[in-house]
Amino acid sequence: MKEAPKISVIIPVYNAELYLKRCIDSVLNQSFKSFEIIAIDDGSKDNSFKILNEYQQFSPNIRTLSRENKGAAYTRNEGIKLAKGEFIMFIDSDDYINPDYLQVFYDEISSGIDDAVIGGLQRVNQDGKQLFSIQLGKDKWSKYRSISPCARIYRKKFLVDNELSFPDIPLAEDLLFSLTVYTKSENIRTIPYCGYNWFYNENSASNTLNKGFNPNLDIKNVLDRIAAIIPKDFSETKLIKFFIKKFTLYWLLDGGRYSTSAEFLRQYKEINDWIRINGMKSTLSVFNREIRDERFMVKLAMFTMNLIEKVGLLKLFAKLYCKG
């Protein structure tokens, strides 16, 4: 009987023909060999599934399937159910990993009792140039700096025993899944390794949909879901409150840039009303030692926005910032 793979690498695929080979090759060329690839074509309209079938013909550790489009959340959940490995990793089809990636994560998680080990990542462009990197420290805040399900390894038993799955909320499934994971175990560790290459694809959903506030994402619904995730006795509630502050600021600045000033102010009021009503106001300063490893540019944006609010210049800021 063939020995089961140690790691199942789940790759959701949708219209990824331009970069799919790079992604798969980066997995096949790993120094660590005990793995399987579960590549699920999510109703692609290009040659993605044809490419997957070509790989499957010569690589016995690749499993592929294709069906109608159901979204990334459904596809990842399907991958978890199909996984034969003791450990699970996710890779997006336009990203790629360094040759020692699986080995590093396997060595980290197999040597202890961790339910998940989280690494950093680097943002790269078409030419492979690093735009920036997110290198994690050992502090508790580090795992909140990146909420992607990628650049980390999970113990499958932990996911199954806790019935952890991705919710069907487009553009928020990663955030909600990761925050739920964080509340289910104290055995989650961060490492400074950055072997995941997060490709800046100008044509991807995350870079094309966010031109103005996305009408398909109800920010209050997402915030309600976050609040529902947090146990009453959760020791990291203050970190999640700070995360909400960071997340909502990103939502306002990203969506507000190409929106009207009136819509920006409406969204701002809606978010801050929710934070006040639900007792989610963060008391952590951007200078607090607990978040010392956060990127400087993130801290600067949060500090500047706080100052604008305090001196009563929000309306002027919206008028100058918003281009809608």
PLM regions: where:
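Nucleotide-sugar donor-binding/catalytic module of glycosyltransferases
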Residues: M1-I219, P231-K232
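Polar/charged side chains located within well-ordered beta-strands of beta-rich proteins
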Residues: R152, K245-K246, E309, F317
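A short, terminal or domain-edge coil/loop segment
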Residues: I169-F177, R225-A228, K246-G255, L284-T304
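Membrane-interface aromatic/basic loop that binds lipid-linked glycans or pyrophosphate carriers
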Residues: S259-G324
